[in-house]
Amino acid sequence: MSKAYEQSGVNIHAGYEAVERMSSHVKRTMRKEVIGGLGGFGATFDLSQLNMTAPVLVSGTDGVGTKLKLAIDYGKHDSIGIDAVAMCVNDILTTGAEPLYFLDYIATNKVVPEVIEQIVKGISDACVETNTALIGGETAEMGEMYHEGEYDVAGFAVGAVEKDDYVDGSEVKEGQVVIGLASSGIHSNGYSLVRKLINESGIDLASNFDNRPFIDVFLEPTKLYVKPVLALKKEVSIKAMNHITGGGFYENIPRALPAGYAARIDTTSFPTPKIFDWLQQQGNIDTNEMYNIFNMGIGYTVIVDEKDVSRALKILAEQNVEAYQIGHIVKNESTAIELLGV
């Protein structure tokens, strides 16, 4: 490496070490459809091996938001990668797509190989769990763009679904049932508010909350719904799905409903994790607003015919997912969501 480049703030050797450290984690994620190895200019994936008649590709990209600030401040980098994958694959899953491959982007003030390895390990762990190949990525050292120790993580996922099996909400009808799949906690949305409330409260994040350190509760990774939902889709006709992310119930559930229909949700039908009670009390936040910011304990929803509810709940239980019948579909021309009990 030239001295001029090093003096400009770019350490190529640290980048090489980071790649070497992450390679074993990346290799764990490979699928048989991946062509070639690491280091190429473009990553390749053989769709013909999927044995699909008319595959539709579904893509999604997302980041982790300011949850990163907590991870950086407390030096806990191993679960943020899980969040990055979950935010992308859970989104494309709502179409019925099986995630195929993932690419990551990490930008940082300075490449610290040990930190990059922890981030990529988390990404790889999530990719292994969802059978998604981590086929490419970029690590950019940009000292003038970020403060010391800071980094950003984003991801891009591609999946595929048979054209005839594509889930778009067009079959939603009155009387169908909304099933909610439990979240693991806050997931990756609302953290600008969360961090504000943490700062205002003055709490010690190493202290315990509900038998766990506060910091572990706040950094609990976003739940991955791919395996249980794909297992459910094989057995039950799913009419629509939603990933409950930014905007909570109010912004996300209507996205999968056709005009003239609403989801009537009974908020007493599922448990709300205690951390949401803490946030609401700390910020004196109206309950309706809480449902417009956070997932409130439900990270993903599926809509099925009433006759399929018992079978759906049984399948999800077999997949070790807590799920609840949280509402049903009604006709409504004025709003797409009705929340009862708030």
Curated annotation (Swiss-Prot):
GO terms for biological process: 'de novo' IMP biosynthetic process; adenine biosynthetic process; purine nucleotide biosynthetic process. The lineage of its organism: Bacteria, Bacillati, Bacillota, Bacilli, Bacillales. It is an enzyme of class 6 (ligase). It comes from the Bacteria. SUPFAM superfamilies: PurM C-terminal domain-like, PurM N-terminal domain-like. One of its GO terms (molecular function) is ATP binding. HAMAP family: AIRS. This is Phosphoribosylformylglycinamidine cyclo-ligase. Pathway: Purine metabolism; IMP biosynthesis via de novo pathway; 5-amino-1-(5-phospho-D-ribosyl)imidazole from N(2)-formyl-N(1)-(5-phospho-D-ribosyl)glycinamide: step 2/2.
